[in-house]
UniProtKB/Swiss-Prot annotation:
Its main location: secreted. It is found in: Secreted. It catalyses: a carboxylic ester + H2O = an alcohol + a carboxylate + H(+). Residues 1-19 form the signal peptide. Glycans are attached at residues 113, 421, 507. It is an enzyme of class 3 (hydrolase). Transmembrane segments: none annotated. Its EC number is 3.1.1.1. It comes from Drosophila pseudoobscura pseudoobscura (Fruit fly). The keyword Disulfide bond applies. This is Esterase-5C. Coiled coil: none annotated. The active site is at 207 (acyl-ester intermediate), 467 (charge relay system). Changing residue 291 to G: In strain: JR50E. The lineage of its organism: Eukaryota, Metazoa, Ecdysozoa, Arthropoda, Hexapoda.
Length: 545
């Protein structure tokens, strides 16, 4: 059904598309009317363009509907995108509620480059564990200064508003993924009006954004809207991506906000539609064991096969094994200390005791580990969980206690379980069942400041190359300082050239600097590019280091 609607909508918009006014590039004609963008010196921006009807009222907890309104006046595309309503981990303090429910927009950034008449397109999905984040959290000026690519940032529903699910056709879930899908369709249909090349669209994202890219690519019809994808620091194999106990959690959500009387999914959905959005999103607090743990209490699900417009109805592993996914080039990445994103908060000194939270793991490891590492819902008995928790602690820490001194091994555990192992699994599946090129790289070059220092609120600990250290060289982020070292400037330029070359390449090749990444499909060994301060090197591995 989604594929049929795709063909119909593509046909409509291709017939309707028009171009930028050559007399004034700030004005663009779209099927809904004329828009006015902003001149930012070295690039143009066209922000907050709606691609879907507001997901409010009866459209809450429903698949997104294409935007229908016709503008009689020129649409003001100079306002930055609003934040989708969320309980945001990056807000310190008790009240983390921010954003609005009516938020489904795309924002377009086009470089001023008179040497190019058209531009390849990067569709960007922000990260945030499917719970928080926004289109504005990652900058675009690095990419605009290079002057080679149009960037489109996508806003999508998050947390319970985007991913509540009862596991049946009545409240199927994955609304945030369906938002992304409709946004990609909008880009395909309309980007030529901005000077973009609809035949040269690549989708990129980081963390949950990277996992989103991968999930989009697991649909065979992805190839109709984009030609390649890059998943930085997250993919569909990560244990925090696919949720197995969404039904119970969604009914618990209903109980928290006053829908405890609901006896079935439809009654629950109707009740939730009547509640203020802020109450629903604020209920996230009740699912956290401590701090912001687990960091993803709501997220993607495997939908019921009879759900209308199901996004996926098989587990990603089974989809890949079936071969029924988009056979287009894909790249997947991880950082050597990705897990610092999850572990660093344990190094913050607590106001009440003056000591770090990591010491509390000595008394609460068996209680907290299943939530920290996302196996609470995948094991059937408490004994299974305790046995696995004990095994992990022994493997990574031996007989040592949790402390600041043992932090490095704790983050190593988090890196392996939450990121690295999933990257290895994804590559293993693709090299056996894929047909189009699949590439991988590992980044090992610590930033001076980053997410580790941000959450730990300290700089006296070596955090390594933490989650986002590579991505923020492409898309700026306030979690790291604004300045780049000379080696990072070179790496940033190489990343931007890599993305550009990947999307315009006719044969799906991928190059970083002077290194050509090697395809994993059909390979007996893992082909992994190592990127460090000193350059790049192709590795052939039996297993990940």
């Amino acid at each position: 059904m989604l594929a049929a609607r795709l063909i119909i909508l593509l046909s409509f918009y291709w017939l309707s598309a028009s171009a930028i006014d050559p007399a004034d590039p700030l004005f663009v004609d779209l099927p809904h009317g004329k828009i006015r963008g902003r001149d930012n010196g070295f690039y143009y921006s066209y922000e907050s363009l709606p691609y879907a009807e507001p997901p409010v009222g009866e459209l809450r907890f429903e698949a997104p509907q294409p935007y229908k309104q016709q503008w009689t006046d020129t649409f003001d595309a100079t306002q930055p995108p609003v934040t989708c309503m969320q309980w945001n981990q990056f807000i310190f303090g008790d009240n983390k509620l921010v954003g609005v429910e009516d938020c489904l927009t795309v924002s377009i950034y086009k470089p001023k480059n008179t040497s190019q008449s058209s531009f390849p397109v990067v569709a960007h999905m922000h990260g945030g564990a499917f719970m928080f984040g926004e289109a504005r959290q990652n900058g675009h000026e690095n990419m605009m200064r290079e002057g080679k690519l149009i960037l489109v940032k996508i806003s999508y529903r998050l947390g319970p508003l985007g991913f509540a699910s009862t596991g049946d056709a009545d409240l199927s879930g994955n609304f945030g993924l369906k938002d992304q899908r409709l946004a990609l369709l909008w880009i395909k249909q309309n980007i030529a009006s901005f000077g973009g090349e609809p035949e040269n669209i690549i989708v990129v994202g980081h963390s949950a954004g990277g996992a989103s890219v991968h999930l989009q690519m697991l649909r065979e019809d992805f190839a109709q809207v984009a030609k390649a994808g890059i998943s930085f620091g997250g993919n569909a194999m990560d244990p925090w991506v696919i949720h197995q106990s969404a039904r119970g959690r969604t009914f618990e959500l209903g109980r928290i906000v006053g829908c405890g009387q609901a006896s079935d999914s439809m009654e629950l959905k109707n009740c939730l539609k009547s509640k203020p959005a802020g109450e629903i999103v604020s209920a996230v607090h009740s699912f956290l064991v401590f701090a912001y743990v687990p960091f993803a209490p709501f997220g993607p699900v495997v939908e019921s096969p009879d759900a209308p417009e199901a996004f996926i109805s098989q587990h990603p592993v089974d989809i890949i094994k079936s071969g029924k996914f988009a056979q287009v080039p894909w790249a997947v990445t991880y950082n050597t200390e990705d897990g610092g994103y999850n572990a660093a908060v344990l190094l913050e000194k607590q106001a009440s005791s003056g000591r770090e939270l990591i010491f509390d793991l000595n008394d609460h490891w068996f209680d907290w580990a299943p939530y920290l590492l996302f196996y609470r819902d995948s094991m059937t008995t408490i004994k299974d969980m305790d046995d696995y928790s004990r095994k992990l602690r022994q493997e990574y820490l031996g007989d040592r206690r949790f402390s600041v001194e043992s932090y490095w091994d704790l983050q190593r555990l988090f890196t392996d379980i939450l990121y690295k192992n999933a990257t290895e699994l994804a590559l293993d599946l693709y090299r056996k069942h894929g047909k189009s090129p699949v590439y991988a790289f590992v980044y090992d070059n610590p930033a001076n400041t980053g997410i580790g220092q941000f959450f730990a609120k300290r700089t006296d600990v070596h955090f390594g190359t933490v989650h986002g250290d590579e991505y923020f060289l492409i898309f700026e982020n306030l979690a790291r300082g604004p300045e780049m070292r000379s080696d990072e400037e070179i790496i940033s330029r190489n990343f931007l050239n890599m993305i550009n070359d990947f999307v315009v390449s006719g044969n799906g090749t991928m190059t970083f600097g002077n290194c050509v990444l090697q395809d994993n499909v059909g390979s007996n060994k893992f082909q992994l590019l190592s990127i460090t301060k000193n350059g790049c090197e192709n590795l052939q591995l039996e297993s990940f280091p």
